[in-house]
Structures are given as C-alpha cells and as structure tokens.
C-alpha cells in the first residue's frame, strides 16, 4: 500500500510538473532557441543587433562582477533605515509622505503624476544610494545647460524613468544570458531583478485620501492610479521586470535572493504576488476605452503571460483567467480586444485620436498579436481592421517617412515595428499579398535611412522574419481625408521634388486641438511650415501656445474648432474611401475648405520635376484678422518686391491680442506696409523658403520669435527651431478691411541654393474672385483663379473663369495647360474648358502631346480643335 501511495504521489507530482508553465514564454521558448541562434549567425542585421545589445550591457555586467553594488545603488529606492516605507500617500496627485519600515529597502514611488522639463543625467553621474529622491536633471528646453538638483516632489517621471532604465539593462542582460549562457549577464540581471522584486513586495499600493486621482487608492476600484505610477497607463516597471523573470526563470530558481531564504519563500511565489498586484490594480484602474484602455492593457500583458495556470494561485486567477478578459470579455473597467477594435474607423482604419495615439495603439495591438499567437490566440485573423489600421499610416506619412504632426502628437519617424509585426504574421500564415504590402513599407524605411533592422533589439531578434523580401514599391496616394480628424493631406511625389501639404480644421477633444483652419507646407522631406509641438507637457504653461491656434498656421480671431465643409477638392476622396482613386493631372492638387467664417483654398502646383510652388488663398469674413505663418529657420527677412529690406520697429507688446498664446511671442517687430512683399526664411542644408503675399490696405506686418517647433531631432533641417532656438514667425495683421472680400493671398516655395524659382507674383482680383499671376524661372506664366460664387470673371486679358479654382499655364507665350476645379468655364483666347454643370477638367501637354481628364462632359477647345468629351482620365488627344 505504501508503494502504491508513493507511486500516486510521484504521478501527481509529474502531472503538476507537466502543467507548470515553461520559461521563457513571452517572446520565445526553449524550442525557438536554435532558430534564434541561427538567425543571429546567418542574418547580418540580427548579428549586428545582438552585438549592440551585448556591447551596451557588457560593460555594466563586467563592472558588476567587480563591484556588485554599483548598479544596485543607482536604483531609486527608499534606502534609509527607518524610512524604508511600506505605505505611501498621495496629495494633489503627487507623492506626499510615507510610513512603515520594511526589512529591506523598498522601491521609491514617483514624485509626481505630471511631467517636468528635466530628464536624468547619465547613469554614471547619478547619486548612489540616493536617500532623498532628489534627482540630477538636464533641461529638455536647454540640454547644454549644467544639470540641476530637482527636488523629489518636483521630479516628474524621473524616478520611474531611472528604474525603467536599469530594469531595461537587466532585460538585455537576461536575453544575452539566455543566448550565450554566460553567467556574468545572469548575475547582473538577477541582482537588479531581485532587489526590485523584494523592494516592491514590501510596498503596499499607494493611498489617496483626498481622492485626487479619482479613487481612494489601495485595492479599491476606480480612478487612474496604478501600483507604481499615478497614472496606470504609465505603470511599466512590471512590464520590464516580467521579461527579466521570463529569461532568467531557471537561474532565479537556482539562485534566490538571500532575503527569500530568510523568510522561507521562493522566487516564483513572490514574483506571482508582485506581478498580480500590478495586474489586479490595472484591471480596475485607468480607462475603459480609448488609448487609456490600450495603454493600460499594455502595462500588464507581459506580467500576465509569465503567470502560471489558474489553479496555481489561491484566488484561481492565473494567465488564462486574465487573458480571457483581454481577448473575449469586456468589464466595467476595461474593454476587451473585440470592443477595442470597434474604435477604429471602418473606412479609414484610423483611431479617433491624434497621430501619436492613433499609431501607438495599433502598434501595441500588433505587438500583442505576435505574443498572443504564441498562446494560440490569433487576434489578427479575427479582427481584419487591425491590418487596415496599420496601413493607414501611409497617407499620414511624409516622403521622409515621418508622421504628420497635429493635435498633441510630437511627430517623428513612423514606427516600422508595426510592419515588422505584420510581416512576421503574414510570413507565419503564408499571406503573399500581406507580405508584399508590409515588405514595401519596410523597404521604403530602409531606403530612406529611417529604419535600420540592426536597431531591432532583442524583441526583434526573437520575432522578426529573417529577411524582408524585395518587392515593387507601392504608388503613393495623392489625397487623403479623415472626416473625423477634419484632416486632409495632399501630395505630389511624381518627381524628385516632392510636394506635400496638410489642410485641417480644429477639434476639441480626442487629443486633437482647436487649431483653427490650419495649413502645413513641406519641402525636402521636412514640414518647413509646421504645427508647433515642443510643449513640455499637458500641464505646462507653454501648452496654451503649442496646443492652440497660435501655434498653427491659421487666422485669428474666429473659428478655432468645429465642422469643416469641403467646397471642392481634387484629386477627390470619394465617400466611403480614405484616399483618392483617380487624379486628373500629375501636376496639380487643390482643396477648398470652409469652416465657420473662414474659407481656405490651397493648391500644389508642380512646374517641373525639380520645382513647384504652393498657393494659399485665405478668406475670413471678419473686419480684423491676423494671418499667422510659422516657418522653421535661423532668420526671417521681409523685403519689398524689388528686394529692399522693409524697416521694422521694435515693440514691447501687441496693441491687440486675440489669444493668450500671443504671450509666448517675443522679439516683436512691426512695420506698416500695404503693398506686395516677400518673406524669406533661411535654414540649414542651404534651404530657403519664400512667401510672396499680395498687398491690401490696413496691413501691419510683424516679425516675432515663436517658441521652438519640435523636441524631436530629424524633423527640421539641421534640427533648426529645436530648443533652445526659436521659430521665426510672420504675422500679417489686416484691420478694418474684411478678409472675405480682400483675402490673404500668398505664393510659397522652398528651394536650395541662391536662385528661387518664383520670379514675380502679381495680384489680379475682382470682387469675389481672387487671383494671382505667377512668373517662374522657366519662362512660365501661371494665371491662378479662386472664386466663392458661380459668376463669370475676367481677371486678365482674354481670360474668363467661372468656378471654384482655375489655373492657366503658358510657357513662352503659348498655353501649356488649363485646369478647371469645380466649375463651368475657363478660357484664354482660343483655348477653353466649358461645361453645362460644374466639373473638374484639365488639358495638359506631355512631350508635345495633349492629354485631357474630366469628371463629366466638357467642351474642350485647343486652337481650332473643338470637341465634346466625356468623363475620362489622362487620355491622349490626337491633335495634329
């Protein structure tokens, strides 16, 4: 009988062993190791990536061998005996006080919920065994300034950032150990992890007696407070610690922390307790929907994945329990994936918030998809909108593969990990079309130098497909429109000189901005006339400038947010689409948008493969208006049309301010000038931007220094207009002169070298029709028309126009092209486009051959030839 009982116990023990989760499990498993080693050996990018990872962490691992306290002492902890707090308290969303004294140092809580303008000095310069929590910091607005000691209660996210940095080193070391078996990396990572684990184990969730974060703190549901951050969506210490635990599982089991031996506990048990604290608090805090929900789940997914089966834990809540609520069933606190994906616009594939959140969320979801597929859950197959959401990045990407900036987004390179995750999935599922589309995106990033696979990190080594197939590049769209975001992109990338503009209305909410009817203009891979995005944080004083109409290229006062109406646009985005499917001509884009009392017509005019210019006709049905135009650069000069510098007088302040954001303008200079003028911005990389503006009565011109444009390197030529530099800004004030009848009309170009392409701009306006004649360097004369009614206007000799937008181009005195945007008539001499109903139509020459395009029936006259043509696109006209 004893032998039978012993056999039963042995069998039960073996069953338990079989049910226990094997490690690693999150990004790789033991069975993947050979494949990963082969990838490192065979693929140059993986070899370089691994070399970088090892090189970045090995110096610390070697130092740890000789001085094991060096890295540990730099963790932000409550080090001082008698003040090793076990319970901390919040007040006004910031750390207030602590009580209790643990037998070991406990992990320090952040000083504040909000950000500040400082970031930590290098690890080597940080104070070891810092008992006060005061942090040495460098100023983001002036990085060259000496570091200052930032008080603990004013330290923003510096404390958490410090610990995340050290845990990230431990992650890298743990991966290197798993690949190589070299114990120095394991010892380094284990000592960091164990110190963090035990120091967290003795800390209770923070209490918030005044309910400043919307809940009571502790274990009670509700509010936004996490376990180790005052916003659960930033509560990321366990995210990093979980991967250390995963790769080091066997080593940690064999080499437990000395304190665990003293209290008779195992690493696995304490890790489960600590990880479940982060998870359980995350389950009942944060936000139910939107980016808060996605970010909240992102904080706890990796800790969930390292948990054991449900029955391992006294509460019956293990890996499968929590995954059910991520993948299947929403709760009153958080939506599950099936409800998350309903947030995406089924037409555009876009998330409703600003670009940073829009593409940050899809990146997280696709990252989860790769991890969940390892657990047998295919969220991509079940939710095809995820693929559409990933591809929605292209219309919102410029030709340098940077994201558009509006709302509270900061900009920067597109996240190519999105496409790597999709390529991995498509490779696993043998989806040829998917492989081609994602490979095209990745190859573009590689060719532009915006993406380098050798920077993949250990997660990429684990999950990326070994190679990116070489495929044909996909043709870029010409126009995109998101009605929810009130955002239009216009692109003309048909030649080496690539043109792009963004035209958009304002939205209050969704991390978007009440920015007015705004415009951004691009050149040479940069947003040269951008939207301001260098604010410190949501809570900083400069937010009122950067996240307002004052930080945008618009007109004040008046419309700042609300519905926009597309009066005309071509290439047109049809209803139910995100991008255009057809285009009338390779040489022109335009859009005419109204919003409130404002109406703005913007056109991209390509004059050759290497040149082009932008038209901006901005109407405002107010008598007093300020036209704001920000352009990055080192200098702004304003001259008359003969090149004479206009005299400006220094001003202490504006006589009138239309928004509190005006307070952020400095170095105010003013001149009164009612004639045509030229504003020029000088930039690094030998780039100059020029804006010609036609004159109107009641004009005052201001040159001001606006705050920096961006905090991100690589978004401006030579990183100009980054802190502590300024953004040279033009303000054209028009008083007692209604700008609907007398609009702001400008022509903008960017060029390299000393020779501008636009030589002369002449106004030609009559009543509700505004126009200019543009003379360019290749003996080309363009006649531009913009009207707000259906009357027939004649602005120049032998010309007639009835429509929303028109362009007649002559080269050497001979008509080269004609373009009619939503109109009935465009004529010069014996060349004309005429229709009974409003149409979009054009005739143009390529290599001496005439082509036509039209959205409906149109009578075309070219010299003696006259024909009635039906709808068609880029069709050859056989004219002898």
PLM segments and residue spans:
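Bacterial Sec-dependent N-terminal signal peptides
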Residues: 1-21
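Structural helix-adjacent loops and short alpha-helical linkers that scaffold large soluble proteins
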Residues: 24-51, 57, 61-67, 88-108, ...
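Aromatic-lined, polymer-binding surfaces characteristic
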Residues: 159-390, 410
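C-terminal, helix-dominated tail/subdomain
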Residues: 378-454
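Beta-strand-rich recognition/accessory modules
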Residues: 682-778
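Non-catalytic terminal regions with compositionally biased, polar/charged low complexity
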Residues: 731-742, 749-880
């Amino acid at each position: 009988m004893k032998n039978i009982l012993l056999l039963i116990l042995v069998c039960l023990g073996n069953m338990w062993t079989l049910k226990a989760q094997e490690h690693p499990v999150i990004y790789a498993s033991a069975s993947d190791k050979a494949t990963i080693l082969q990838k490192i050996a065979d693929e140059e990018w993986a070899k370089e990536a691994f070399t970088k990872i090892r090189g970045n962490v090995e110096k610390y691992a070697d130092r740890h061998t000789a001085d094991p306290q060096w890295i540990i002492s730099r963790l932000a902890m409550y080090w001082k005996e008698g003040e090793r707090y076990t319970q901390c308290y919040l007040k006004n969303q910031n750390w207030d006080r602590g009580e209790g004294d643990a037998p070991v140092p406990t992990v320090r809580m952040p000083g504040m919920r909000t950000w500040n303008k400082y970031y930590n000095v290098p690890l080597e310069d940080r104070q070891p065994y810092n008992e006060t929590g005061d942090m040495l910091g460098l100023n983001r607005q002036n990085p060259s300034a000496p570091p200052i000691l930032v008080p603990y209660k004013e330290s923003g996210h510096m404390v958490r950032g410090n610990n995340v940095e050290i845990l990230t080193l431990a992650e890298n070391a743990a991966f290197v150990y798993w690949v190589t078996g070299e114990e120095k990396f394991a010892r380094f990572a284990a000592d960091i992890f164990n110190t963090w684990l035990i120091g967290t184990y003795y800390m209770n969730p923070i209490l918030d007696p005044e309910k400043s974060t919307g809940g009571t703190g502790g274990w009670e549901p509700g509010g936004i407070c996490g376990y180790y951050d005052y916003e659960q969506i930033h509560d990321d210490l366990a995210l990093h610690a979980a991967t250390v635990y995963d790769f080091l599982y066997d080593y940690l089991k064999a080499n437990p922390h000395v304190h665990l031996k003293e209290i008779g506990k195992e690493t696995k048990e304490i890790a489960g307790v600590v990880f479940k604290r982060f998870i359980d608090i995350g389950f009942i805090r944060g936000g139910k929907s939107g980016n808060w929900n996605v970010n909240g789940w992102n904080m706890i997914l990796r800790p969930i994945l390292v948990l054991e089966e449900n029955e391992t834990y006294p509460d019956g809540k293990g890996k499968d329990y929590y995954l059910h609520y991520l993948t299947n069933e929403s709760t009153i606190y958080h939506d599950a994936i099936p409800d998350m994906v309903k947030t995406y616009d089924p037409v555009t594939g876009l998330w409703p918030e600003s670009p940073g959140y829009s593409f940050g969320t899809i990146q997280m979801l696709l990252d989860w998809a790769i991890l969940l597929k390892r657990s047998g859950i295919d969220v991509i197959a079940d939710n095809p909108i995820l693929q559409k959401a990933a591809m929605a990045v292209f219309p919102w990407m410029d030709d340098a593969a940077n994201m558009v900036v509006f709302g509270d987004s900061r900009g920067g390179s597109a996240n190519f990990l999105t496409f790597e995750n999709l390529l991995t999935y498509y490779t696993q599922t043998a989806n040829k079309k998917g492989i081609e589309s994602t490979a095209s995106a990745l190859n573009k990033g590689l060719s532009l130098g915006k993406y380098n696979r050798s920077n993949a990190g250990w997660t990429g080594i684990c999950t990326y497909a070994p190679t990116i197939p070489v495929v044909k590049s996909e043709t870029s769209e010409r126009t995109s429109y998101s009605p929810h975001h009130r955002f239009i992109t216009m692109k003309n990338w048909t030649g080496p000189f690539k043109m792009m503009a963004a035209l958009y209305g304002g939205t209050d909410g969704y991390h978007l901005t009440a920015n007015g009817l705004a415009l951004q203009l691009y050149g040479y891979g940069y947003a040269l006339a951008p939207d301001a995005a260098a604010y410190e944080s949501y809570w900083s004083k400069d937010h009122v400038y950067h996240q307002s109409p004052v930080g945008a290229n618009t007109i004040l006062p008046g419309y700042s947010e609300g519905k926009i109406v597309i009066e005309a646009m071509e290439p047109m985005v049809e209803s139910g689409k995100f991008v255009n499917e057809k285009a009338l001509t390779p040489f022109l884009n335009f859009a005419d948008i109204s919003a409130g009392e404002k109406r703005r017509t913007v056109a991209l005019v390509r004059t050759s493969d290497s040149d082009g210019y932008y038209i901006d006709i901005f109407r405002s049905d107010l008598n007093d208006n300020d036209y704001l135009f920000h352009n990055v650069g080192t200098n702004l000069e304003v001259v008359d049309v003969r090149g004479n510098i206009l005299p400006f007088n220094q001003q202490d302040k504006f006589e009138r301010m239309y928004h509190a954001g005006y307070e952020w303008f400095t170095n105010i200079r003013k001149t009164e000038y009612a004639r045509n003028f030229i504003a020029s911005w000088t930039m690094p990389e030998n780039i100059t931007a020029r804006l010609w503006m036609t004159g109107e009565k009641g004009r005052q011109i201001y040159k001001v220094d606006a705050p920096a444009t961006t905090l991100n390197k690589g978004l401006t030529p030579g990183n100009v207009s980054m802190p502590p530099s300024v953004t040279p800004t033009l303000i054209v004030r028009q008083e007692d002169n209604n700008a609907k009848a007398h609009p702001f009309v400008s022509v903008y170009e960017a060029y390299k070298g000393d020779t501008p392409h636009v030589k002369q701009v002449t106004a030609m306006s009559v009543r509700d029709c505004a126009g200019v004649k543009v003379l360019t360097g290749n003996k080309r004369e363009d006649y531009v028309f913009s009207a707000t009614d259906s009357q027939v206007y004649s602005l120049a000799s032998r010309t007639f126009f009835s429509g929303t937008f028109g362009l007649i181009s002559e080269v050497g005195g001979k008509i080269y092209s004609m373009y009619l945007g939503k109109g009935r008539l465009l004529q010069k001499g014996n060349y004309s486009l005429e229709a009974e109903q409003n149409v979009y139509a054009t005739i143009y020459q390529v290599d001496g051959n005439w082509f036509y395009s039209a959205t409906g029936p149109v009578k075309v006259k070219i010299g003696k030839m006259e024909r009635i043509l039906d709808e068609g696109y880029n069709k050859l006209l056989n004219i002898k």
